[in-house]
From Swiss-Prot:
Residues 189-264 are annotated as: N2. The N0, N1, N2 and N3 domains are periplasmic, while the secretin and S domains form a channel that is partially inserted in the outer membrane. The N1, N2 and N3 domains each form a periplasmic ring. The secretin domain forms a double beta-barrel structure; the outer barrel has a diameter of about 110 Angstroms while the inner barrel forms the central gate with a small pore in the closed state. The lineage of its organism: Bacteria, Pseudomonadati, Pseudomonadota, Gammaproteobacteria, Aeromonadales. GO terms for cellular component: cell outer membrane; type II protein secretion system complex. This is Secretin ExeD. The gene is exeD.
Amino acid sequence: MINKGKSWRLATVAAALMMAGSAWATEYSASFKNADIEEFINTVGKNLSKTIIIEPSVRGKINVRSYDLLNEEQYYQFFLSVLDVYGFAVVPMDNGVLKVVRSKDAKTSAIPVVDETNPGIGDEMVTRVVPVRNVSVRELAPLLRQLNDNAGGGNVVHYDPSNVLLITGRAAVVNRLVEVVRRVDKAGDQEVDIIKLRYASAGEMVRLVTNLNKDGNTQGGNTSLLLAPKVVADERTNSVVVSGEPKARARIIQMVRQLDRDLQSQGNTRVFYLKYGKAKDMVEVLKGVSTSIEADKKGGGTTAGGGNASIGGGKLAISADETTNALVITAQPDVMAELEQVVAKLDIRRAQVLVEAIIVEIADGDGLNLGVQWANTNGGGTQFTDTNLPIGSVAIAAKDYNENGTTTGLADLAKGFNGMAAGFYHGNWAALVTALSTSTKSDILSTPSIVTMDNKEASFNVGQEVPVQSGSQSSTTSDQVFNTIERKTVGTKLTVTPQINEGDSVLLNIEQEVSSVAQKQATGTADLGPTFDTRTIKNAVLVKSGETVVLGGLMDEQTQEKVSKVPLLGDIPVLGYLFRSTNNTTSKRNLMVFIRPTILRDAHVYSGISSNKYTMFRAEQLDAAAQESYLTSPKRQVLPEYGQDVAQSPEVQKQIELMKARQQATADGAQPFVQGNK
């Protein structure tokens, strides 16, 4: 048996669907009489192609009819309005699904947060964050709750620290409340009071009043920090400018009047013990600062000599005590505060820079000297002096040996000759063949390093002083000659001035020099003293901390061939080698200089680098000690581990322990430590 009431409702729904189908595709008409709310929701979802989830608590009958054709947006708003009338709301989800819940549950659901660009319309459930500039939200929120449906889906919450309102409800209601807030939130701090100070400093007064006002707000005051009165100092006229609400301005003005009183003393004196800076150098900086302060206070003027100035009716004096590295300053309180800030910013630990240089030099040289010399007893012959064994000298030394039996001449010739020499004679002819091949290799690696302060020049010098004859003078009374000797330093020199820039970059002004005494004298300078090999680089580079860059280098290759020969005879193929001397020399030299700066900003980094260097040096000592024989070498002294105290005698160790005990007793606030007699 079919229920007649239910059949009538189904017929009504069918008629409504037929009416909707007969309209345009984007227009709808609705007519529901005593229809179940679930059927109404399902019909709307089908027409709008929306998936709708219905909460189980959504139940009831509805009666509604639309006489006009509605477009899709109007139809959706009509749907929301009907649900609002019956105490329900729609919550859109991220995936496009709609959820129908009771209105009082909607405000705790994931409803969208809107703003001025898209505030929402109609009966959509939205949340709006409204900033308030001139009125306390604590006082405004209760008024708005009376205009909102707090029993349903509406809600008004205030947040004091940011002075904002969080309004939740139907979009039309929320927009109306936002408009109410805008009209109520009128600027109430346009009035300004200017207080001319007679004795106190405007800057110091503003700092004091601001701190007091801030403390009052943080202790639970009703006024938000955004609504607190604003206090600004006008240093030019030594005035305080106050703006805000009338009551707040009156309280600030009264406070300023009470503080702006004449002090009994015209100044005070303080002693600043510096931790890092040098008091004597800082005095000059503070004198310049005091000059600027006086110009600001008086509108121009000059300071008295010696760092004294008359500022604000009082004397300003700045001096340094070098024995304690302290500054003694006498000034008015406001000036003292400014100078104290300057001292605090100047007396800081300056960064240091570790500069490590690597100097690499590789040199190779090869030489070949071949020569044949002839002599005749009747006179004549060929002789080449570049062999360091001329045949004429050999003949004279041989004749001296044959006639007198002395070998002095031959010994002197042998001292200056290297290589092989072979000779023979037949009849009146004699021949001398000399041959010499040389090969030299040299690898030099130097790694000087130095630590210096930022913007402080430092130098490093390791080498020896070589005596060089600079002149000579004959005596007027005798035949003696007096030579003047100077000392020239040779070795490794490093002079550097680092400047730390922004972003851990270091500008290095570097002067690098590596010098040594040449093993081979330049031709024709044997009587003039030693010859020096010098490599110098003077440069300025910008390097990032920890990076290694090349400063400069040299790649040099020289090939030299010297031929001494008898004209015509020395040019004969093959046989010409018997009438000439050939000297071939080839040399190569590669020189590179690298640099690496490292910024040391704190003691931990400095200690870590020192520990690494110390440990590496100690490891070399241990390795050398392990390779030495206990029978041939005495026991090598090795450095203790890094951070470990050097062994002391028992008496010294006892005194150190007593000193540590006294320091510990003083730090713990105990009774003074007294050593008793035993």
